[in-house]
């Protein structure tokens, strides 16, 4: 029987260099990360997703890779990596890593060989044109920062394609040699103990755009089947988590019959979730949940609030996007790429823990696998003085002491500045203070994670949206193996109540609530405080 561990997983995303510095050089490392696994264990994490940790010039937070088979020396050694994997395993945590193979760094030896010699075997590993292509600005990913998707290389005397920054030349994934190398990279890290990959930029990875070939690509998604087949052969329980900002209509091509991507991030639902939060009504999120297709096979959606990138609102209408900007980032400096916000969750709510807790409870109640960005569990803010998406990647705030407990290095040697001023500074927001106090934000989130882990109905089961006649409430019913959990969330800033008109419910047992007196009134009415939430198990303990 397949090990579908991801169905009830709690995924925690870590940028290693910003998490914990063990050797005092100012950059987080694998030894430091291993030393802080107890924090993740207290939170209830079962899977750690690592942002790129490979050798890199680090012009794009490590997503510009110069060696796929190594560790950035500032982060440690392969030995440190394996020790971290074992330490995580001892705590029941799996590890998945970023697979960034749409492009390389322009400093990668493959690209250096390709540009130096038109007869190099690596020349066709990239996408070249002798003449300047038409529409070199068509399809820019980073408006306002990126100037084109083709650049001229003087050494090669040719144009190369880069869907992202010009220092990230695209690999030619129609080349069988490139595809074989991708499988080799996967096999290497699987052998070192990882449990799968978060696959970066999947729509661009499989897109044959710009490639000149006599054999047109009939189905670009077939590449995903190749990757899945290799993964299943090497490590059957490993997963593929796709970063794919796609419509629901496109989703079946990514899941297929369970033989492509294991999970896909629900970007559509994420944007509708924030539109709901901005408007104070559950209606947009309710509509997206109703429209979201059920993955075939054993596929799963991955759900999230924030991540290491901008909050991408590009799929909303201009009016809807402006509503989100007005609610969560009215200053133009908070906005980015004409489509998103470069803010962390806590600062978007101005530190309002009532609304933050409701948002986290909502995340964990959504059908799918929840993904948490490091630091959000303690309510960290962002540093808007940093460029672009770097604003949300500041070092983890561990304590109120020097450098927030992140590093003993001098302040000017830190990989990124710590937030040391204002209400979100490490003097006020840190893990040490919160873990010591049972009524802290961290413990509230840990309690929610515990409720989610004890509710496989949410991860495994089918979900039904219950109509209680109020657009400001989202009430979900999740069923699995004869058990049922009902979750309710109030998007309004005023108290709400509702009745469950269901003859199959004989008893409701509160699992989680923001109310100190419990959500169930004497007449069976369920009451929610402003921005309140509750989780209820139907008919007693889970059987």
Regions picked out by a protein language model, each given a short descriptive name:
Residues 1-543:
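Active-site and adjacent substrate-binding regions of carbohydrate-active enzymes
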């Amino acid at each position: 029987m397949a090990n579908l561990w991801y169905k009830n997983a709690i995924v925690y995303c870590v940028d290693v260099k910003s998490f914990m510095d063990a050797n005092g050089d100012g950059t987080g490392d694998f030894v430091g990360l291993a030393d802080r696994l107890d924090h993740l264990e207290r939170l209830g994490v079962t899977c750690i997703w690592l942002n790129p940790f490979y050798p890199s010039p680090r012009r794009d937070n490590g997503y510009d890779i110069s060696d796929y088979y190594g560790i950035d020396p500032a982060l440690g050694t392969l030995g440190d990596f394996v020790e971290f994997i074992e330490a995580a395993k001892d705590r029941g945590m799996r590890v998945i890593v970023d697979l960034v193979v749409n492009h390389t760094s322009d400093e990668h030896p493959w690209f250096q060989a390709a540009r130096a010699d038109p007869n190099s075997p690596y020349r066709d590993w990239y996408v070249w044109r002798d003449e300047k292509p038409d529409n070199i600005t068509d399809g820019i990913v980073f408006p306002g920062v990126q100037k084109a998707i083709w650049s001229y290389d003087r050494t090669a005397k040719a144009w190369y394609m880069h869907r992202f920054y010009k220092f990230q030349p695209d690999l030619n994934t129609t080349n069988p040699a490139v595809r074989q190398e991708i499988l080799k990279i996967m096999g290497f890290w699987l052998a070192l103990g990882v449990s799968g990959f978060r696959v970066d930029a999947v729509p661009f990875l499989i897109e044959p755009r710009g490639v000149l070939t006599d054999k047109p690509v009939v189905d670009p998604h077939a590449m995903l089947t190749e990757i899945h087949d290799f993964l299943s052969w090497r490590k059957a329980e490993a997963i593929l988590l796709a970063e794919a900002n796609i419509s629901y209509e496109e989703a079946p091509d990514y899941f297929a019959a369970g033989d492509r991507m294991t999970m896909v991030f629900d970007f559509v639902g994420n944007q509708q979730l924030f539109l709901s939060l901005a408007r104070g009504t559950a209606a947009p999120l309710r509509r997206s949940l109703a429209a979201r297709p059920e993955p075939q096979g054993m596929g799963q959606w991955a759900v999230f609030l924030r991540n290491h990138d901008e909050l991408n609102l590009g799929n909303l209408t201009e009016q809807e996007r402006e509503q989100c900007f007005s609610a969560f980032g009215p200053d133009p400096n908070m906005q980015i790429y004409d489509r998103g916000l470069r803010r962390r969750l806590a600062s978007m709510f101005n530190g309002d823990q009532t609304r933050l807790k409701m948002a986290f409870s909502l995340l964990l109640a959504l059908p799918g696998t929840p993904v948490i960005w490091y630091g959000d569990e303690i309510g960290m803010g962002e540093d808007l003085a940093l460029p672009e998406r770097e604003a949300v990647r500041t070092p983890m705030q561990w304590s109120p002491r020097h450098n927030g407990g992140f590093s003993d290095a001098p302040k000017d040697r830190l990989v990124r500045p710590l937030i040391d001023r204002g209400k979100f500074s490490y003097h006020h927001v840190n893990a040490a203070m919160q873990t010591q106090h049972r009524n802290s934000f961290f413990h509230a989130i840990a309690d929610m994670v515990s409720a989610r882990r004890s509710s496989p109905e949410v991860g495994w089961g089918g979900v039904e949206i219950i109509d209680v006649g109020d657009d400001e409430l989202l009430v979900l019913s999740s069923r699995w193996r004869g058990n049922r959990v009902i979750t309710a969330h109030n998007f309004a800033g005023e108290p709400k109540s509702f009745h469950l008109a269901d003859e199959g419910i004989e008893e409701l047992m509160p699992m989680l609530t923001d109310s100190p007196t419990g959500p169930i009134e004497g007449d069976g009415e369920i009451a929610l405080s402003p921005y309140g939430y509750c989780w209820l198990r139907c008919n007693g303990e889970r059987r």
